[in-house]
Amino acid sequence: MASQPEYENWQQLMDLVKTAVEKDQHELLLTMMMTPDERDALVARINIFCELMKGEMSQRQVSQMLGVGVATITRGSNELKAKSEQEKAVIADLLLKQ
């Protein structure tokens, strides 16, 4: 019986996801790790970041469009504000369809 969990920190989880991507098994892994509600919440979070980065709608409008609370939008906004301009550029490149 193991006395320690296999995965103890965020970096180990990121390494696991990277390995799954390299083996083209990421969909199986991520689907197993999250319930349908958690997957929906993650999709909403990604859309929050997309809309905040576009800057075309108010937080209230984003909230209404995505069906999430304004506090959820605010938390996403605060996370985005904490990133450097370089990090924001990388995130925009990943998320925004040009």
Swiss-Prot record:
Instruction: Indicate what this protein is called per its UniProt record.
Output: Trp operon repressor homolog
Disulfide topology:
none
Native species: Vibrio atlanticus (strain LGP32) (Vibrio splendidus (strain Mel32))
For the keyword Ligase, the answer is: no
> What does this chain do?
This protein is an aporepressor. When complexed with L-tryptophan it binds the operator region of the trp operon and prevents the initiation of transcription.
Has the keyword NAD been applied to this entry? no
Q: Which SUPFAM superfamilies match?
A: TrpR-like (SSF48295)
Name the PANTHER family for this protein: TRP OPERON REPRESSOR (PTHR38025:SF1)
Gene Ontology cellular component list: cytoplasm
Q: The organism sits in which domain of life?
A: Bacteria
